[in-house]
């Protein structure tokens, strides 16, 4: 096995584990992003709780770390499957960062960065799908459908979308989709977890990325609890 590949494996994870959402929110707003909004350590929660400018900065950073690490792997001469493994480990690092006791974000922006390098056109279609749903405040289902469509696009329509080495890319996209599902399902239990059946909880987490159907109740729960604890 290539020594470069062996070095890039932990490097990919550690780069992914840099929690920019947490760091910027602490530095510029003095808050622990994990205790506000959805509790997610990612750009979307920063936008809701710390402002659009900070959220955009986090988004750009998270996309960039996914794209740059896989581009670096290619520049160092690694094969495509090795580049993809490094990219997936970067996403895993974002989702389960050692610096935050393995409780990170959802890895969507980092996944976008990786996907854009693997196959730009399908990645942009997935992004467009998520943004379209997001316009109607249905971002989580849009992300699920967009990411889920990636292996379909690269596997069955690779010629139309110009996907090179489509079998390898398809396996990579399948891995990316699996990481997203696992991260959603492994979310810590909330005070609402026991209020729904196991089947509904699995569906809600996998498709809606939350424990309950109500989006407004879910994204405001941490902020309300924090204010109550402060006596506000």
From Swiss-Prot:
The metabolic or biological pathway listed in the UniProt record of this protein is: Lipid metabolism; phospholipid metabolism
Protein topology in the membrane: Multi-pass membrane protein
Principal cellular location given in the protein's record: membrane
GO biological process, any: phospholipid biosynthetic process
Task: Please list every transmembrane segment annotated in the UniProt record, as residue ranges.
Answer: 4-24, 54-76, 80-99, 107-127, 143-163, 168-188
Q: Which InterPro entries match?
A: G3P_acylTferase_PlsY
According to its UniProt record, which reaction does this protein catalyse? an acyl phosphate + sn-glycerol 3-phosphate = a 1-acyl-sn-glycero-3-phosphate + phosphate
Quaternary structure, per UniProt, is:
Probably interacts with PlsX.
PANTHER family from the entry? GLYCEROL-3-PHOSPHATE ACYLTRANSFERASE-RELATED (PTHR30309:SF0), INNER MEMBRANE PROTEIN YGIH (PTHR30309)
Name it.
Glycerol-3-phosphate acyltransferase 4
């Amino acid at each position: 096995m290539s020594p470069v590949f062996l070095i890039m494996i932990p490097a990919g994870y550690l780069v992914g584990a840099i929690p920019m959402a947490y760091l910027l929110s602490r530095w510029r707003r003095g808050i622990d992003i994990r205790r506000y909004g959805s509790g997610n350590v990612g750009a979307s929660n920063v936008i809701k709780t710390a402002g659009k400018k900070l959220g955009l900065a986090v988004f750009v950073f998270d996309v960039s770390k996914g794209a740059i690490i896989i581009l670096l792997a290619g520049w160092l001469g690694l094969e495509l499957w090795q580049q993809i493994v490094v990219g997936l480990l970067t996403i895993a690092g974002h989702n389960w960062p050692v610096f935050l006791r393995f409780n990170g974000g959802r890895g969507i922006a980092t996944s976008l960065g990786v996907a854009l390098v693997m196959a730009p056109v399908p990645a942009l279609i997935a992004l467009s799908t998520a943004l379209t749903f997001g316009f109607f405040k249905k971002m989580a289902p849009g992300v699920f459908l967009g990411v889920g469509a990636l292996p379909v696009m690269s596997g069955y329509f690779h010629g139309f979308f110009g996907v090179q080495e489509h079998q390898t890319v398809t396996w990579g996209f399948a891995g990316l989709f699996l990481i997203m599902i696992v991260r959603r399902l492994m979310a810590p239990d909330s005070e609402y977890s026991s209020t729904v059946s196991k089947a509904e909880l699995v569906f809600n987490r996998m498709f809606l990325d939350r424990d309950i159907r109500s989006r407004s109740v879910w994204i405001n729960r941490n902020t309300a609890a924090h204010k109550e604890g402060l006596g506000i």
